[in-house]
């Protein structure tokens, strides 16, 4: 599968989050070119501030492969991860991060911080942003615009 195809799947997860009135962020994890888990924001659904799409996908992937390390895995997320999610990605030893839209308020990869480039981290994550950035941004803008109307 191509990265754009994988981001389309992550966007579908983000749309699913919006159906549940969650901030529309979706995520998938691949290992050996196969999708092993999906995640979407579930903070409201689970009454927990930490149930971001990345956390959901990482926990699911770890459970599926029966290991807390996701070495050689790639994570695709529609929005630039926050600090908490970046640390989870590092701790899971995920190899590659691909994200869609930048997050100017809490994005810890390139927007408010370059967290994944910090020398104190014990694992290096390769990252590239901008995959289907327009589609990811529009989904978020539409979601928040609908919130302001109500």
List the predicted regions and their residue ranges.
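Small-residue (primarily alanine) positions within well-ordered alpha-helices
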Residues: 10, 14-17, 27, 37, ...
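Residues that line or immediately flank small-molecule/substrate-binding pockets and catalytic motifs
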Residues: 43, 77, 101
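Short beta->alpha transition motifs characteristic of CBS
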Residues: 36-43
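Helix-adjacent hinge/juxtasegments
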Residues: 47-51, 55-88
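Zinc-dependent deaminase
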Residues: 1-20, 68, 81-150
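Short beta-strand scaffold segments in enzyme catalytic cores
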Residues: 25-33
């Amino acid at each position: 599968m191509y990265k754009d195809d994988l981001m389309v799947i992550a966007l579908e997860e983000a749309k699913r989050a919006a159906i549940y009135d969650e901030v529309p962020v979706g995520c998938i994890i691949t290992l050996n070119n196969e999708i092993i888990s999906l995640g979407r924001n579930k903070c409201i659904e689970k009454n927990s501030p930490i149930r971001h799409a990345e956390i959901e996908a990482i926990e699911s992937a770890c459970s599926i492969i029966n290991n807390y390390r996701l070495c050689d895995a790639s994570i695709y997320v529609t929005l630039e991860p926050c600090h908490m999610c970046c640390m989870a990605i590092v701790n899971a030893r995920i190899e590659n991060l691909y994200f869609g839209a930048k997050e100017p308020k809490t994005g810890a990869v390139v927007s408010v911080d370059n967290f994944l480039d910090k020398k104190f981290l014990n694992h290096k994550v390769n990252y590239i942003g901008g995959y289907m950035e327009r589609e990811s941004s529009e989904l978020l803008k539409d979601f928040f615009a609908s919130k302001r109307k109500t």
